[in-house]
Swiss-Prot record:
Protein name, per record: Cell division topological specificity factor
GO biological process: one example: regulation of division septum assembly
Function: Prevents the cell division inhibition by proteins MinC and MinD at internal division sites while permitting inhibition at polar sites. This ensures cell division at the proper site by restricting the formation of a division septum at the midpoint of the long axis of the cell.
Keyword terms, alphabetized: Cell cycle, Cell division
InterPro entries: MinE (IPR005527), MinE_sf (IPR036707)
Top-level taxonomic group: Bacteria
Species of provenance: Nitrosomonas eutropha (strain DSM 101675 / C91 / Nm57)
Family designation: Belongs to the MinE family.
């Protein structure tokens, strides 16, 4: 193996890595292009409404938008905290609101 062969094989590896990265970027761009622009704002507003009633973290909510040929689906998943005594939780929320 000569010195030229070493540099030649490195170039093809670099090109394939660059091509793979570009394909990933294009796939992400296509995925986000089909999402409605209001989705982040909708997620934030839903989170505010949910927090009025239940204390949840930001990462406890996920919004998924899917688009087929003839329908659009908005899926909302919320991981609610375990509550041992719901009455105490309601009382705590009332105290916090005052």
């Amino acid at each position: 193996m000569s010195l030229l062969d070493y540099f030649k094989s490195s170039k093809s590896k670099t090109a394939s890595v660059a091509k793979e990265r570009l394909q990933i970027l294009v796939a992400h761009e296509r995925y986000y292009r089909n999402k409605p622009s209001y989705l982040p704002q909708l997620q934030e507003e839903l989170m505010q409404v949910i927090r009025k009633y239940v204390q949840v973290d930001q990462d406890a909510i996920s919004v998924k938008f899917e688009q087929d040929d003839n329908q659009e689906t908005l899926e909302l998943n919320i991981t609610l905290p375990d509550t041992q005594n719901p009455r105490n939780t309601q009382q705590d929320m009332i105290r916090n609101a005052l």
